[in-house]
Amino acid sequence: SAAITAALVTGCVRPVDVEPTGTTSASPGSTSTPAPTTSQTSALHQTDAPSSLRVAITFDQPGVGLREGDTYSGLDVDVARYVARYIGVTRISFVEAVTEQRETLLATGQADLVLAAYSITPDRSDDVTFAGPYLSTGQGLLVRARSRIRTPEQLPGFTVCSVQGSTSTEELVDNHPGLHLTVKPRLSDCVDLLKESKVSAVTADAAVLSGYARESSAPDVLRTSSTTFTTERWGVAMRRDDTDLCEDVNDALADMVETGAWKRAVRSNLGTSSTLPHRTLTPPKLQACPEPRPSTTSSDGSTPTSS
């Protein structure tokens, strides 16, 4: 039931208030991120700007969204902080986004925005509104360093782990028969199975997998495949009717690119041109926000009925 689903989601939410800052995430080599430009901020829907923002991110993905104690790091964290400052929000509360429950966090009011390596798809756009995209990547493979697996065509007969509710899982089921699929709620669960040699590969977006390859406990334990085999565009998700907020987030993302903050955040969190494809290092073109949906109530407050 809906009540049970909400209870399950609440159990994995750990909100911690943090002040939006002008620096990138607390990671080695992080650099200063400039504040949003004040000249463009005046064009926002300031009367609607909340004093705080609840943002759902992953808690277990190095370089993308990672929680260590009360410290948060990753590209999604940096983008969330930049957006918050741009729209005039003074405080962010981060909550955990488990892949299968991202839409539920928005629907139940436990999050205002979701930045969690969340690929924009037509089906998802029926349920939520996406601003962005803010990153372009593709599905890849994470394997042990000595593995001979390089491409998805080599996967039949092997066991592959992916995250429940992800586009990566859909891709394997629809287009790559003959492999054995293990599905877990969190990507870190899959990576643990790979390190323990219980699966032969992990699949997810390449930008996410590169973080696990860099953070593996010993040098040359894990590596990513050299090619990607889908196109994924990460968006900032919000409730379906939050069209004004969508416009504001798009303005913030455009400003982040213009100031150079986007490029610095991507390179400091995800790597350099030697480890990432060109498209991931290039700001993607922002898509237009959807038009506001017509009201379902009449001028007298009643709900129209069909004849």
Where are these regions (language model features)?
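Ligand-binding clefts/hinges and TM-proximal coupling segments of bilobed small-molecule sensing domains
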Residues: E170-K184, D220-R223, L253-T305
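Short helix-initiation/N-cap motifs at beta->coil->alpha
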Residues: I92-T104, S147, T167, T182-E196, ...
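Extracytoplasmic small-molecule ligand-binding "clamshell" domains
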Residues: E19-A117
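C-terminal motif of bacterial Sec signal peptides marking the signal peptidase cleavage site
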Residues: L8-G11
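Acidic, polar ligand-binding/catalytic clefts
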Residues: R81, I92-Q154
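Periplasmic-binding protein-like
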Residues: T58, L135-V143, A206, S210, ...
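Extended ligand-binding regions for polar small-molecule ligands
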Residues: V13, V77-I87, F158, S166, ...
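A ligand-binding cleft/hinge motif common to bilobed small-molecule-binding domains
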Residues: T104, A117-D126, D174, S200-T230
